[in-house]
Amino acid sequence: MPQLSQTVLIQNRLGLHARAAVKLVQLAQSFDAVLTVQSQDGREATADSVMGLLMLESAQGQNVVISAEGSQAEQALQAVCQLIEQKFDEDE
């Protein structure tokens, strides 16, 4: 099964902080897919680890690459990218 990936811009003011990471992990775990997030500096974490995502230190204005593999990879990738593009549903 091919791996899909997409680059997305972190737009929310606080970046990929704890609350945003929890939302991303919960969403990622709802799909039958393995998702990874790669920061601009090349560090990578699986999307099922809040601590791993926090260690990426992805801030507002930085791009991250989301990769997905598995039977629901396309849906998972689309949903996670949409969550990030919608600023993790946070009010600014």
Swiss-Prot record:
Q: Where in this chain does the entry annotate a coiled-coil region?
A: none
Under the heading Pfam families, the entry gives: PTS-HPr (PF00381)
The principal localisation class reads cytoplasm
Q: Which residues form the active site?
A: 17 (pros-phosphohistidine intermediate)
Record Gene3D superfamilies: HPr-like
Please give the GO cellular component terms listed in this UniProt entry.
cytoplasm
Has UniProt tagged this entry with the keyword Cytoplasm? yes
Q: Which UniProt keywords apply?
A: Cytoplasm, Phosphotransferase system
Q: Name one GO biological process term.
A: phosphoenolpyruvate-dependent sugar phosphotransferase system
The record's annotation in NCBIfam families points to: PTS_HPr_family
Report the protein's function.
Component of the phosphoenolpyruvate-dependent nitrogen-metabolic phosphotransferase system (nitrogen-metabolic PTS), that seems to be involved in regulating nitrogen metabolism. The phosphoryl group from phosphoenolpyruvate (PEP) is transferred to the phosphoryl carrier protein NPr by enzyme I-Ntr. Phospho-NPr then transfers it to EIIA-Ntr. Could function in the transcriptional regulation of sigma-54 dependent operons in conjunction with the NPr (PtsO) and EIIA-Ntr (PtsN) proteins.
Under PANTHER family, the record lists: PHOSPHOCARRIER PROTEIN HPR, PHOSPHOCARRIER PROTEIN NPR
Q: Which family does it belong to?
A: Belongs to the HPr family.
Protein name per UniProt = Phosphocarrier protein NPr
Which species is the source of this protein? Vibrio cholerae serotype O1 (strain ATCC 39315 / El Tor Inaba N16961)
